[in-house]
A protein has these predicted regions:
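Well-ordered, non-membrane alpha-helical segments in soluble/globular domains
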Residues: 1, 57-62, 132-137
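Intrinsically disordered, low-complexity terminal regulatory regions
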Residues: 1-44, 139, 146-149
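Short acidic, S/G/P-rich loop/turn micro-motifs used as interaction or catalytic elements
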Residues: 22, 82, 123-127
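Regulatory sensory and allosteric helical modules in signal-transduction proteins
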Residues: 31-96
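Short, solvent-exposed, Trp/other aromatic-anchored flexible loops in extracytoplasmic proteins
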Residues: 95-98, 118
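A short, aliphatic-rich beta-strand micro-motif
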Residues: 99-108
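Juxtadomain coupling helices with adjacent low-complexity linkers
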Residues: 113-149
């Protein structure tokens, strides 16, 4: 993913992977959870502690439940728009003073979301959306074909 930092114009790229990590004791209904499993950061930016995004509940994050994200739309936000769309996630990211955010779902072979890509730029007003789409296709192919060998 490091190569996509330059291609997308991002300083940060995160891979958000969805899973069912626990269930309701009374009903057995599973809670949809996620982990941020990969983080690519350019050499001049500080790391965001992705450990706090382990086995986290998706329902806490408005942006991950967005209808547009579910329709596989590529979502673009300025810092202010991102904070308005999901204040909790913006707080968790530590208000890194980004200029732009892009979020895109990753789908399996059956069209079901198994994760998302989150690209963040602190320098560029515009993230290269075509490169984000190319990264999503590459990651979908890896996951849908059994992973990295």
């Amino acid at each position: 993913m490091q190569e996509y930092l330059h291609l997308t114009g991002s300083e940060y790229i995160f891979l958000v992977e969805y899973h069912n990590g626990s269930e309701n004791v009374m009903t057995g209904i599973q809670f949809c959870r996620f982990d941020i499993t990969l983080e690519a950061v350019d050499d001049e930016s500080s790391y965001i502690q992705i450990e706090k995004f382990r086995d986290d509940i998706v329902a806490r994050y408005d942006i991950l439940l967005s209808e547009d994200l579910g329709k596989n739309k590529l979502l673009y936000y300025t810092q202010e728009e991102f904070e308005n769309a999901d204040r909790y996630l913006a707080q968790q990211m530590g208000y890194i003073n980004a200029k732009s955010y892009v979020l895109l779902n990753l789908k399996d072979n059956h069209g079901k979301a198994f994760g998302s890509i989150l690209c963040i730029s602190t320098d560029n007003e515009q993230i290269n959306l075509l490169a984000v789409r190319e990264l999503s296709i590459e990651l979908e192919n890896i996951f849908n074909n059994g992973g990295i060998e």
